[in-house]
Structure formats: structure tokens, C-alpha cells
Amino acid sequence: MDFTTNILLSIIVFLGIVLLLVALLLWVRNKLMPKGEVKITINDDKVLTVPTGNTLIATLAEQKVYLPSACGGKGSCGQCKCRVVEGGGTILPTEVGFFTRKQIQDHWRLGCQVKVKENLKIVVPQSILNVKEYECTVVSNRNVATFIKEFKVQLPAGEHMDFVPGSYAQIKIPKFDINYADFDKELIGEEYLPSWEKFKMFDLHCVNTEPTIRAYSMANYPAEGDVFMLTVRIATPPFKPDRSGFMNVNPGIASSYIFSLKPGDKVIMSGPYGEFHVKEHDTTEGGPSTNSGTANSQLSTLNSKLPEMIWVGGGAGMAPLRAQIMHLTRTLNVRDREMHYFYGARALNEVFYLQDFLQLEKDFPNFHFHLALDRPDPAADTQGVKYTAGFVHNVMYDTYLKDHKAPEDIEYYMCGPGPMSAAVVNMLDNLGVAPENILYDDFGGGAPKKSN
């Protein structure tokens, strides 16, 4: 038997063993994997009959019950929390870090980590049952800053969505292969094209090999109609060590997809989600009233006994803060509650919705807009735009909180980059502000950590 024949026989034997092992694994899986249908009881009320084998979050989505998920069901955001009071097995190591010991005892789980193998009884927030999925039409998708788009889509005709300002939406991201060179340059805008060309943005390429989901805060408030409006920052790859260009890794999947869309395109959105809402308060002696419980139940007048409010934002974190502020002013006409908005940006041309907030200052004596730019900006000086040079947490302290009589009594609402949020929390902690007075937009990453 010659050498070539030996090689061929070895390959045939090897492939035969591999095929036998694969067949064995499939047989074992078929025997061990439960078949048929089971029942999922939601909140001791709604009963679903579903097939086995998939994750709880995916199974519920097939039944039009949408648990939130900022990571596409990969177990990294911790947003798809629910109580699994019967069935579901024991909590997995991948879930433990998202819950306190008390929550684990109360059967809290991540929907993306629970396999549907048996009858389940689960408890979810009632608001989850009001979430709907829509096929929306892109209305506009223009750049409002160098790397940030205002992405606006219209709900289908006849559809209406009740939501509380500060909520977020989810967008389905399909498989794709996108070249940034194909982006519509008119939608980016002449003002921002030089920076895109300088950083060779149009050389980037992004591939998404499996459908996923991402979450974004809504910048719109209810009076603006049946739309989703998001502010989305493009997530570029990191720079090479020598700063000669971007590293050869995928840009952000969701932001690449959104930046590629044009008016008229169809997208799948769901919402509303989230609990980043203006706090409820007692405003009368007769009992509790609300200024944020539902879009239709908010009071048109609020009295001066309510605490002062401060919003702190940066970058695309503008979205939910704009929604809350515009709703309180333009819709509810709140004039007897002190309100301040501190917004940080690198330069004036990175600040969007500026004219809206400057006009609010004129129309509402109780509203004050504070702009913080990283460094002195000649463009802002030339245009006469009022700002303070420095990072937003320092500007907030030096120009206002340092001399405030009771900063611990203020309500703080925050959304922005992680380092900004951490710096603000650390500063407020040093001023004696209790954690319950600091609200932040969060997709499962946990509260911003104080620095040591």
C-alpha cells in the first residue's frame, strides 16, 4: 500500500469518526431536549402556550411580550430582568452579578439566560405588557453634531403610543454588510463632512452576522406625535497606537446600521421601555398627585413646594433630558419650579438643540441653561453664546452648587458618557446628596460608580 493510499484512508477514517460523533451528539440532544409545548403564566393572569427549547426572552417576543434588552439577549446588559417564581431551574453564574442576595431569594432571573423547558410562572412589570413592536418609516436622519445623528421614524398609520418622557425604544438590527462610503453625504451635512474626511470615516466597513437588538433613549416628548426620535452617536473603532488611523475592527453595529438609513426606509422598533422618569410627588393636602406617572396624568401646574430640578447631560445623552424638559415646559407649562440644565460638549459645533433651550430661557424665567465647553471656544465667543470653559461637573459645582444653600434637596437627572456620570455622582456624594435623589438613564450597566 503506497503512501498516498495511506493518507486517503486516514482522512476517510478521521471524517467517519467526526460524523459518528456529530450523529451521537445530535441523538443525545434529541433525547435530552424537551419536546412539545409548555405553559407560561404571566402575573397570575395571562397564560401562553409555547414551544420548548428557546430562551424565555425570545419565546416571549414570539408571543408579542417584549422584555427589554440593550445587548440583544447576550446576557451583558442585565435589562431583561423578571421573576421566575415557578420552573426555570436555578440561577446561573452568568446572572448572579446582576442581582442582590435578596433578589436572588425572590427568584429574579435574566430572561435571556432562562431556557423554556417546562411550565413557568413569571412576574414582569405591568408596563412591559403595554410594549408594542412597530414597523416604522424613517422620516429624517440628519447629523446634528459631527458624529451624532437625530434619527426620526414615524409609527404606522393609525398606531399611537402612550409613553412617559425619559423612556427608551429598541431597534432591531438585521444582518448586513455596510461600507461607510455608501452613506448619504447630504444627510451628514457640509458642516461635518470635513471632519469625516479628516478621520477617514468613509473608509470604514461594518459587518453584522446575526440579527440583534439595541436600545436608545427617546428624545421626543408626547406632544410631538407618534414618532420615535433618537440621538445616536457613531461608535468608531479605537485608534491605532500611532494615531495613524482606526484599528481593523468592526465599528458599532447598531450605530453603523442607523447611520446607513435614509428617509423612506423601514425599521422595526419597539417601546416604550424604562423607568427614567421625573419623580412623582404629593402636590395637594388631599393626597398624592403625579408629574410623571403616565403621559396623560401629569399636572398642568406644580407648586413651589416641589424640589428644584437639575439635569446634567453630555453627547447623545441629550435625548431623554430634552424629552423631560420640553414636556415640563412646552406641554405642562411649569413655571413655579426651579429648573437648571447643565450640558457639556467639546465645542460649540457639537451642541445641538441649543436654540430650543435658549428660547426656553426667554419663555420660562424658572428655566436656566448652562453650557460647559471643554476649553475656550472662539466660535462661541464670536457668536455671543454664553458658556463656561471646563468639564460639566466642575462647571456645575463652581458656578452654582458651591454656593447653593441645600444642594442635597435638589433632584438630579443625568444622562451622558460614563466618565461624566461618575464625576457628577462623586461630586454630588461629596455634597451630601442621597443616592435616591440622583436619577440616571441606564440600560442595565448599573449606577455610575463613585471614584475613590
Where are the model-predicted features located?
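Cysteine-centered iron-sulfur cluster-binding motifs in ferredoxin-type domains/subunits
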Residues: 69-78, 111-115
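Ferredoxin-reductase
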Residues: 137-265, 346, 374-376
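Intrinsic disorder
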Residues: 297-300, 304
